[in-house]
UniProtKB/Swiss-Prot annotation:
It comes from the Bacteria. ATP binds at residues 12-17, 117, 153. Keywords: Amino-acid biosynthesis, Aromatic amino acid biosynthesis, ATP-binding, Cytoplasm, Kinase, Magnesium, Metal-binding, Nucleotide-binding, Transferase. GO terms for cellular component: cytosol. Gene3D superfamilies: P-loop containing nucleotide triphosphate hydrolases. It comes from Mycolicibacterium paratuberculosis (strain ATCC BAA-968 / K-10). Its cofactor is Mg(2+). GO terms for molecular function: ATP binding; magnesium ion binding; shikimate kinase activity. Its main location: cytoplasm. This is Shikimate kinase. Monomer.
């Protein structure tokens, strides 16, 4: 069992929105690993970061991602920082990984004042976002088998683009 598609990208790139719509188009389930982490731990991600630190959060995240990659056969959405873990990047090999690309300007606009995103909290959000983009873009690009620009594109157009580039067996299911 393996996911039909694994979505990666920065906060605000549309992983949850696109993921739900893509899953519907393919007639499969959707799993957001951030939600799975919160369900497993019984704690919000921001609390895990604040109490246990980013390192512990990434350890839990890697366990959840590895399990999802073997147990979930629908569309999987990873947290924005999951690719910073070498173990997660290794586990993604051989999967259909879709990088939802976004500019810093659009990402800051979409994330607004969302306090659920611990790495973007506080002042200078735009600068923090640009730093995350610079740090993570090379990791996303290396992990991705499909890249799609989400800037100024509606979710329906992004989903259609992804479906058109999925391996034939998955794309055929979406057409039926």
């Amino acid at each position: 069992m393996a996911p039909k598609a694994v979505l990666i990208g920065l906060p605000g790139s549309g992983k949850s929105t696109i993921g739900r719509r893509l899953a519907k188009a393919l007639g499969v389930g959707f799993l957001d690993t951030d939600a799975a982490i919160e369900q497993r731990t019984g704690r919000p991600i921001a609390e895990i970061f604040a109490t246990d630190g980013e390192r512990e959060f990434r350890r839990i995240e890697e366990e959840v991602v590895r399990a999802a990659l073997t147990e979930h056969d629908g569309v999987l959405s990873l947290g924005g920082g999951a690719v910073t873990s070498p173990g997660v990047r290794e586990a993604l090999a051989g999967h259909t990984v879709v990088y939802l690309e976004i500019s810093a300007t659009e990402g800051v606009r979409r994330t607004g004042g969302n306090t659920v995103r611990p790495l973007l909290a506080g002042p200078d959000r735009a600068e923090k976002y640009r730093a995350l983009l610079a740090e993570r873009s090379p990791l996303y690009r290396r992990a991705a088998t499909i890249r799609v620009d989400t800037n100024r594109r509606n979710p329906g157009a992004v989903v259609r683009y992804i479906v058109s580039r999925l391996p034939a067996t998955d794309a055929c299911r979406a057409a039926t």
